[in-house]
Swiss-Prot record:
It is an enzyme of class 3 (hydrolase). GO terms for molecular function: adenosylhomocysteine nucleosidase activity; methylthioadenosine nucleosidase activity. Pathway: Amino-acid biosynthesis; L-methionine biosynthesis via salvage pathway; S-methyl-5-thio-alpha-D-ribose 1-phosphate from S-methyl-5'-thioadenosine (hydrolase route): step 1/2. This is 5'-methylthioadenosine/S-adenosylhomocysteine nucleosidase. GO terms for cellular component: cytosol. Transmembrane segments: none annotated. The keyword Amino-acid biosynthesis applies. The keyword Plastid does not apply. Substrate binds at G77, I151, M172, E173. Catalyzes the irreversible cleavage of the glycosidic bond in both 5'-methylthioadenosine (MTA) and S-adenosylhomocysteine (SAH/AdoHcy) to adenine and the corresponding thioribose, 5'-methylthioribose and S-ribosylhomocysteine, respectively. Also cleaves 5'-deoxyadenosine, a toxic by-product of radical S-adenosylmethionine (SAM) enzymes, into 5-deoxyribose and adenine. InterPro entries: MTA_SAH_Nsdase, Nucleoside_phosphorylase_d, Nucleoside_phosphorylase_sf. Belongs to the PNP/UDP phosphorylase family. MtnN subfamily.
């Protein structure tokens, strides 16, 4: 079984419409859509926005349905200038941009007694990269950073880039999903399409391009499912 997680209705709608033998299950205010996509058994999860929602949803997904792997799909704000709206980021690893326990000797972004970053599964990264190339999308591999703030100001963006110069994109759930998968030893990957440039116009461009980003990220998931 393949677990798929998206934070917003807009980010999972295309995938939900592809599910056959659909069964809707609600646990602790989290919606799960169980069924099949192209004969592959899936559970599509509407996590809600933010790190706590993402961690709760991922934990429920793992404990209730025991997925073999987890795919996180959705949108993100670009931090790297090589990414434009509609482009795709495949996570090699994920960390928090708003965690700071440096006073106790930890790295910025590191939760105490946890890794500095959470590495995506190598095989899933290779598969996602292959799909992006086959679909002739502009895709990049790299670090994605997460925090409980929508990055809609240039000053916020610059602070994150100063602290995490290798970060390619920013959003609000991926690292919580990654940490939960790490703790439960479930392979994962994060694929996000760019909906905005994490700048002063981010809120407007997000609203305008979330549909395009959802389409791109959903296409990657659908193609990956054919090989899982």
């Amino acid at each position: 079984m393949i677990g798929i997680i998206g934070a917003m209705e807009e980010e999972i709608l295309i995938l939900k419409e592809k599910i056959t033998d659909l069964e809707e299950i609600s646990i602790a205010h989290v919606k799960f859509y169980k069924g099949y996509i192209d004969n592959q058994e899936v559970v599509l999860t509407l996590s809600g926005i933010g790190k706590v929602n993402a961690a709760i949803s991922t934990t429920l997904l793992i404990n209730t349905f025991s997925p073999d792997v987890i795919l996180n799909t959705g949108s993100a704000g670009a931090l790297d200038h090589s990414l434009n709206i509609g482009d795709v980021l495949i996570s090699t690893e994920a960390t928090y941009h708003d965690a700071d326990a440096t006073a106790f000797g930890y790295e910025l972004g590191q939760i105490p007694n946890m890794p500095i970053a959470y590495a995506a599964d190598d095989d899933l990264v290779t598969l996602a990269q292959s799909v992006v190339e086959q679909q002739e999308m502009n895709g990049k591999l790299g670090l994605i950073v997460s925090g409980d703030s929508f990055i809609g100001e240039v000053s916020q963006r610059e602070t994150i880039k100063t602290n995490f110069p290798d970060a390619m994109a920013v959003e609000m759930e991926a690292t919580a999903i990654a940490q939960t998968c790490y703790q439960f030893k479930v392979p994962f990957i994060i694929t996000r399409a760019v909906s905005d440039l994490a700048n002063g116009e981010a809120n407007m461009t997000f609203d305008e391009f979330i549909g395009e980003a959802a389409k791109s990220s959903s296409e990657i998931v659908l193609e990956m499912l054919k090989s899982l």
